Design a protein with these regions (language model features):
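C-terminal leucine-rich, beta-strand-based interaction scaffolds used for sensing/assembly
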Residues: 328-329, 340-343, 357, 364-462
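Short, hydrophobic/amphipathic alpha-helical patches that form generic packing surfaces
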Residues: 90-102, 300-304, 425-432
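P-loop NTPase nucleotide-binding core
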Residues: 40-212, 254, 264-290
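The catalytic "switch" region of P-loop NTPases
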Residues: 184-215, 219-330
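Amphipathic alpha-helical "lid/sensor" segments that cap RecA-like P-loop NTPase cores
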Residues: 291-293, 297-382
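Long, acidic, intrinsically disordered low-complexity segments
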Residues: 23-56, 290-303
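A short acidic (Asp/Glu
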Residues: 48-49, 75-78, 223-229, 256-262, ...
Length: 462
């Protein structure tokens, strides 16, 4: 039996029936507020957005799910450093608008809407507006001033031959002058999205009572320097339109939604103002102080993925999540799996799969979990951190100091400390460090606030 590791490889029915929401996350996700959905790799951002798409479609609203990794026709264009940000940014905006246009055109053809003719008419306007988008960035101007003056004078005197007189004089003057003026400076990025916004407003009106949901996944696949430009498109042309809800899936440390400029204005989206909220899946999946809740979450996760298939494979399948855990794991093995996963569903699935291979036809025991966690760390995480020398040294220091000397797996880091903060963030992105609690206040120094981290289980398990 094989459990899909990535949500996009599963069909819609599987996505709908296997989704498990942590705490109040589902209620927050279903709200019509604009939201940014943060989460590290493997926390279930794509699964959550695809699950939301299924729910929205069942309510007769219109939903567009766009994987930003797939937009555009020229591979590598956005990351091509030989092109200016102006060119790359303009291509990104046009490609995004064209993708939205194509998805809406599919809706107009395949679904019944309140005003079909109006929808098609405004789609034409959106198509026209998408080609007029322009981003202005760093510029270099060259001005040429030149001119040529030419004059000629001729004097001739002639008489008939036999006898004769012939005299001639010619004078020619040519003057050419050219000057060049080159100016180089940085102009504030700006976009002209008025026609886009008007077209989208007309599209929403044509949909009638149905709401338009725009789900943008894999935001962090866009180069960092271009992300504020796309965010600005959303802020100026999409977010102000009543009847549209935008949800964005992103990796927090690899995202840049906001770029201030010296004039006091900004490019992009201001989280908390333009977008109502940013929701972190990592925070919802922190179970350090609720072990029972963590075990219930992962038990339901495994049962939702495996239960339906087991009914087709064996005569007496487990009837609920608790029975599945009891029959598949020995007494202490499942709590150890939950601890090893550190709140990351994809890690839990991969560790369980490796442990099942080690156990063969027997229930998975504690030794299987520990060996599988170590193998998964070496296969998936160790290779990535080895390519980053500062991160590798930092991880080795933390394991030696925290695990080796202090006999712990957790430590505190001052939120205001810049020392080694970037390296710690890289380890966090790689799922080698995990946040257990944010905003821990020191009672003796109330002005100092800490984040509590845990070192990944695979780094130290023997």
């Amino acid at each position: 039996m094989r459990i899909p590791r990535r949500a996009e490889s599963a069909d819609r029915y599987t996505l709908a029936t296997t989704y498990v929401a942590a705490g109040s996350f589902a209620a927050m996700l279903n709200s019509t507020d604009h939201q940014i959905l943060y989460g590290r790799r493997g926390t279930g951002k794509t699964h959550a957005l695809l699950y939301l798409r299924n729910l929205v479609e069942n309510t007769r609203d219109v939903v567009l799910y766009i994987d930003l990794r797939t937009i555009g026709s020229a591979g590598g264009l956005y990351s091509d450093s030989s092109l200016s940000p102006t060119v790359r940014g303009t291509h990104l905006l046009v490609d995004t608008l064209e993708t939205i246009h194509e998805e809406l055109l599919t809706v107009a053809i395949e679904q019944e809407t309140a005003d079909q003719d109006g929808l098609l008419r405004h789609l034409d306007l959106l198509g026209q507006a998408s080609t007029s988008v322009e981003v202005v960035g760093e510029v270099e101007r060259e001005t040429k001033v030149g001119g040529t003056v030419e004059s000629a004078r001729s004097l001739g005197l002639a008489a008939s031959a036999h006898p004769g007189l012939n005299a001639s004089a010619t004078r020619r003057r040519s003057v050419t002058r050219e000057s060049r003026l080159r100016r180089t400076g940085v102009e504030r990025h700006h976009v002209m999205f008025g026609p886009v916004s008007r077209a989208l407003r007309g599209i929403v009106e044509s949909l009638g009572p149905a709401r338009l949901w725009l789900l943008l996944d894999e935001w962090s696949s866009i180069p960092l320097d271009l992300q504020p430009m796309l965010a600005d498109l959303l802020r100026r042309s999409v977010l102000p339109v009543a009847g549209i809800t935008v949800k964005i899936g992103a990796i927090e440390r690899r995202s840049r939604f906001y770029l201030p400029n010296p004039s006091g204005d900004y490019l992009g989206i201001e989280v908390g103002s333009d977008a109502a909220s940013a929701v972190s899946l990592d925070d919802f999946l922190i179970f350090d102080h609720a072990r029972t809740r963590a075990q219930e979450f992962f038990a339901e996760l495994f049962y939702n993925h495996a239960g339906g298939r087991l009914k087709l494979m064996i005569h007496s399948p487990p009837q609920d999540a608790a029975t599945l855990v009891e029959e598949t794991f020995t007494h202490n093995a499942f709590p150890e799996l939950v601890r090893a996963a550190e709140g990351v569903p994809r890690d839990a699935i991969n560790i369980a799969a490796l442990a099942a291979q080690l156990a063969h036809d027997e229930p998975i025991d504690l030794a299987d979990i520990r060996r599988a966690a170590r193998d998964w760390y070496l296969r998936d995480k160790h290779t990535a951190v080895n390519a980053n020398e500062p991160a590798r040294r930092m991880l080795a220091f933390l394991v030696d100091e925290v695990v080796g000397r202090r006999r712990s797996r957790t430590f505190l880091l001052d939120q205001l400390s810049d020392a080694r903060r970037e390296t710690v963030n890289q380890l966090y992105d790689a799922r080698l460090l995990h946040v257990l609690r944010r905003g821990i206040v020191d009672r003796h120094n109330p002005g100092r606030v800490y984040d509590g981290f845990a070192i990944d289980y695979g780094c130290y398990v023997a």
